Amino acid sequence: SYQDFIPEIDLYERPTDYEENGNYVFVGVRQCGKSYMLYQRIQRLLHEGHDIREIVYVNFDDERLKMMKAEELDLILQAYAAMNEGKPLLFFDEIQNVDGWEHFARRLANQKYRVFITGSNAKMLGRDIATTLGGRYWTRNVYPFTFKEFLGSKGVLTLQTEKSGEVADLQWMHSPRVRAAVERAFNDYFHFGGFPELRNIVAKRIWLNDIYNKIFFSDLVVRNKVRNDNALRLTIRRLAECVRQPTAYNRISNLVQSTGVTC
């Protein structure tokens, strides 16, 4: 079944607080680690004594579920009830692929199910979620790794737990070997960013280019019905070149028009 592989996943745990009976939606850019937040929560629940049979994890990116309709979502609950007693803990990955999913999600909250959902920013922006789910879910924004998390995920810095919380072991400052490892990690982080998946990818630039194109076309062009994607692409490039510098709209407009692209 879907969830059988989750206990075996080697995760870098990211700190997140949960209300005991809260329902949660994790939103963020593609490949920022939203699914891993679900895996992390499932592993924590299993560690606390929950049985794997209490967990229902469904990945709606699965091609076998591409044609699923909102009225068929209740089949998940019916199938669970046929095999188990009690209410399951529900984990739905990329549920926004099912049109009308929000009605099902609201009903689950009203019926006191524990639900954890992920969705891409393309269809599940934070401001949309508040309206769509009627305040029944907590929203958690997920971002790529910070540099501290990046170091931790690569095992470069050890962390020691004290009564005051987690603090970095500063002994690395006196170790040339570890210091060199930190500098190499920073160079990697500076050039490629903190997407968790990049840790295991050799062709990082190709992977990033693929993610950029998916975000550009699916999350920007299609979502906002942009008619001139070339003008948008040039605008993004100009803004990326002017990080931390004021940029006038007229300057961008003139730049785009000078290339023969009409806004």
What are these regions (language model features)?
Residues 1-16:
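N-terminal pre-Walker A segment at the start of P-loop NTPase domains
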Residues 26:
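Hydrophobic anchor at the beta1->P-loop junction of P-loop NTPases
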Residues 30-31:
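Walker A (P-loop) phosphate-binding loop of P-loop NTPases
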Residues 34-35:
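Conserved lysine of the Walker
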Residues 56-88:
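Short glycine-rich substrate-engagement loop in P-loop NTPases that contacts/grips substrate
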Residues 114-120, 141, 150:
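Structural recognition of the conserved hydrophobic beta-strand(s) that form the central parallel beta-sheet
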Residues 123-139, 151-156:
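Short regulatory helix/loop adjacent to the ATP-binding pocket of P-loop NTPases
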Residues 157-263:
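Interdomain hinge/linker elements that couple catalytic modules in large macromolecular machines
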